[in-house]
Swiss-Prot record:
Encoding gene (name): cut-5
Reported consequences of knocking out the gene: RNAi-mediated knockdown results in disrupted alae formation in L1 and dauer stage larvae with alae often present on only one side of the larvae.
Function per UniProt: Plays a role in alae formation in L1 and dauer stage larvae.
One Pfam family from the record: CUT_C
Topology Cytoplasmic: residue spans: 380-395
The protein, known as: Cuticlin-5
């Protein structure tokens, strides 16, 4: 009995040893096909097939193991089956694109598609041994680019550029006396009726439209009041009402002169937008504005003697208060004579025009010359008697 067991053990060890001693001889070769992967394990066999990938290698002895995709042994579609006969010389593993998580990777340089997977070759179907191998099987399918070119030489005349640039209108702002045709006003009294006029001149008629907006009045020291908003609508009817547009490139409105307390100069700052007139329109669109409200009245009255203000054609502002009761009717304004217009005496300063300043300079120069001549004459008169007295003594 013991003899039989010993013989059986020797036969079993020889069988196991034969499985373990089997190994792959040389380097496997890989061929890529069209539709699927197929991994063939041959024993000294060279075969040809129409497969995506075909791996061929030689083993020392007959192959009784199996081949499978790594990490997919439990999937029947991802492994080969062990041969049940001793006469089997090979085993095959057939894989399609959508099975066993075959990796697909696009390449841009070179352009194409990589298909790759890991195949484990086990010589024993039950366990792995040191003779087993893992192969990374990879196929590259290159994209072919064929560029078909045909040169056609066409001679065309160069395009002729016809361009014409319209000159933009030249705009100006004026403060006139009483009406759109009145003379310019540079010095005015509070309550005087003036006409604010914006005009633009252009060589091309019926081409442009204008919009006066964003108007401010400034005292020169940062105190600003807004008269027109960005749409061209008035904000205070006692300062300036909504503008009239008699023509496409003219806007204006009459208003009474007002001033800041303790300030003699006022600076007006407005923006004028020029747009191209729409074809077919007889008139330009003008802003549709509601009646402007009245601002809150100030508690500070201007000084009684500060009744003359200078107007400058500049443009900018912030909120200030004007008292409508301080506006003087136009009929009550008294015309100034020549001396009042050119020599305006005030408490804190002397304001004169260029003519008055010139006359004052000439007058001072004349008085200086008269004084100098008088001094020289007096000095000469006092020296003459002394000279005569000296001559008589010498005699």
């Amino acid at each position: 009995m013991n003899f039989i067991l010993a013989v059986f053990a020797i036969i079993l060890l020889q069988a196991v040893r034969g499985e373990i001693d089997n190994a792959i001889v040389g380097d496997p070769s890989v061929e890529c096909g069209d539709d699927f992967f197929e991994v063939n394990i041959y024993h000294s066999c060279s075969c040809v097939g129409n497969f995506i990938i075909k791996v061929k290698f030689d083993t020392r002895t007959t192959f009784h193991g199996l081949a499978f995709v790594q990490n997919h042994l439990d999937n029947p579609d991802c492994r080969s089956f062990a041969s049940k006969t001793d006469s089997a010389k090979n085993s095959s593993l057939r894989l399609t694109f959508d099975q066993c998580a075959i990796e697909k990777r696009h390449s841009t340089s070179p352009r194409g598609l990589f298909l790759s997977t890991n195949v484990v070759v086990a010589f024993n179907p039950e366990f792995l041994t040191k003779n087993d191998r893992v192969f990374k099987v990879q196929c590259f399918y290159m994209e072919m680019e064929r560029r078909i070119q045909k040169v056609i030489q066409i001679s065309m005349p160069p395009p002729t550029m016809h361009s014409k640039q319209l000159n933009m209108p030249v705009c100006k702002y004026e403060v006139l006396d009483g009406s759109p045709t009145g003379p310019p006003v540079y010095f005015a009294t509070v309550g005087q009726m003036v006409y604010h006029k914006w005009t633009c001149d252009t060589e091309h008629e019926n081409t442009f439209c204008m919009l006066v907006h964003s108007c401010f009045v400034d005292d020169g020291n940062g105190q600003r009041v807004q008269l027109l908003n960005d749409k061209g609508c008035a904000l205070d009817k006692y300062l300036l009402t909504n503008l009239e547009y008699p023509t496409d490139l003219m806007a204006g409105r009459e208003a009474h002169v007002y001033k800041y307390a303790d300030r003699d100069n006022m600076y007006f700052d407005c923006q004028i937008s020029i747009t191209v007139k729409e074809p077919g329109l007889d008139y330009c669109d003008v802003p549709s504005c509601p009646d402007p409200p009245r601002r809150r009245r100030s508690n500070t009255l201007p000084a009684p003697d500060d009744n003359i203000t200078a107007i400058a054609a500049h443009i900018e502002y912030e909120d200030s208060e004007i008292i409508s009761d301080y506006i003087i009717p136009n009929d009550d304004i008294i015309s100034l004579n020549w001396l009042q217009r050119n020599f305006d005496m005030r408490i804190s300063e002397l304001c004169m025009t260029a003519i008055g300043t010139t006359l004052l300079v000439f007058l001072n120069a004349f008085l200086f010359i008269i004084s100098l001549v008088s001094i020289v004459h007096v000095c000469c008169f006092r020296t003459s008697p002394k000279l005569e007295k000296t001559k008589s003594t010498m005699l």
